[in-house]
């Protein structure tokens, strides 16, 4: 079987988690505290065997100031030993370069691929297509790249970034996000057939059955999936075991988190 990666998602708003895990009774303090300390949440997903963590900058997507979120994602990366892939919307290539230089393993580029293609090519050469990837958030197959660019089709965007040297893509449809209704497999097959880029899909996954369906597309280059809401609501069988263990170990976990937070503190980005 072709290896397939499941990546938990953390959404950040002003440096705080937008979601909180629904734990077993007795873990209320553990999980509520994590909303204020995303580093702890990243460490928890790692302890639960995450091989990568997906972080989304909700502030930037909404056009708001995201200084706190930018600082937080660097702290998170320094606190875990697996890659963090960071989806943010920045106005210039230099903002992505600073994140990479600060240690964030992977950044997902969108708008600036259109507004500064030469700068993106340079960034790819400097940091490699493994660390510089591209993000598509589509609606009815259209991608909104902001007032300076407007709408392009997802196919136009994917072919464009492939020509720049991109070799990995995160793809989601707005209607999938938080819906727990699964993903449109025909859409994924269509975008997978455009290039030979590796593809991570995101949004909509609600159950192991949804995962198995996506995994069938692995021969097309779909090698991973980002899961948010379903992971926080414990919809997968293994999670019940994790939450029961965490309920018993809550004081010990907090002690570990406090120690890790002290060791991983950093200066401003």
Feature locations, PLM:
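Conserved anion-binding
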Residues: 13-28, 97-177
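Structural preference for beta-strand elements that scaffold enzyme active sites
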Residues: 5-9, 52, 81-85, 105-108, ...
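Conserved, mostly hydrophobic/aromatic
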Residues: 11, 45, 53, 99, ...
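Catalytic cores of alpha/beta
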Residues: 79-106, 186-223, 236, 240-241
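Alpha-helix-loop-beta-strand connector modules within alpha/beta enzyme cores
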Residues: 63-86, 121-137, 180-208
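C-terminal helical cap(s) of enzyme catalytic domains, especially alpha/beta-barrels
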Residues: 119-127, 215-269
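Short catalytic helix/loop segments, enriched in acidic residues and glycine
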Residues: 24-43
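Glycine-rich, proline-tolerant flexible connector loops at the mouths of alpha/beta enzymes
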Residues: 50-71, 111, 171-180
């Amino acid at each position: 079987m072709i290896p397939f990666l499941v990546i938990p998602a953390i959404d950040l708003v002003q440096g705080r988690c937008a979601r909180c895990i629904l734990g077993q009774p007795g873990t209320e303090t553990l999980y509520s505290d994590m909303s204020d300390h995303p580093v702890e949440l990243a460490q928890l997903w790692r302890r639960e065997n995450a091989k990568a963590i997906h972080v989304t900058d909700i502030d930037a997507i909404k056009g708001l100031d995201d200084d706190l979120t930018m600082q937080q994602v660097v702290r998170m990366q320094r606190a875990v030993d697996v890659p963090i892939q960071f989806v943010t919307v920045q106005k210039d290539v230099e903002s992505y370069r600073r994140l990479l230089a600060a240690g964030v393993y992977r950044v997902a580029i969108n708008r600036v691929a259109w507004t500064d293609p030469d700068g993106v090519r340079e960034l790819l050469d400097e940091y490699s297509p493994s660390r510089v990837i591209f993000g598509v958030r589509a609606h009815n197959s259209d991608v909104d790249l902001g007032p300076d660019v407007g709408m392009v089709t997802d196919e136009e965007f994917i072919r464009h970034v492939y020509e720049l040297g991109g070799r990995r893509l995160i793809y989601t449809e707005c209607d999938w996000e938080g819906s727990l209704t699964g993903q449109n497999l025909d859409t994924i097959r269509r975008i997978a057939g455009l290039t030979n880029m590796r593809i991570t899909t995101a949004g909509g996954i609600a159950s192991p059955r949804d995962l198995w369906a996506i995994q069938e597309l692995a021969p097309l280059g779909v090698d991973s999936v980002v899961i948010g809401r379903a992971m926080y609501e414990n919809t997968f069988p293994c999670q019940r075991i994790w939450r029961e263990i965490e309920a018993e170990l809550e004081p010990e976990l907090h002690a570990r988190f406090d120690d890790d937070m002290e060791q991983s503190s950093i200066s401003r980005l």
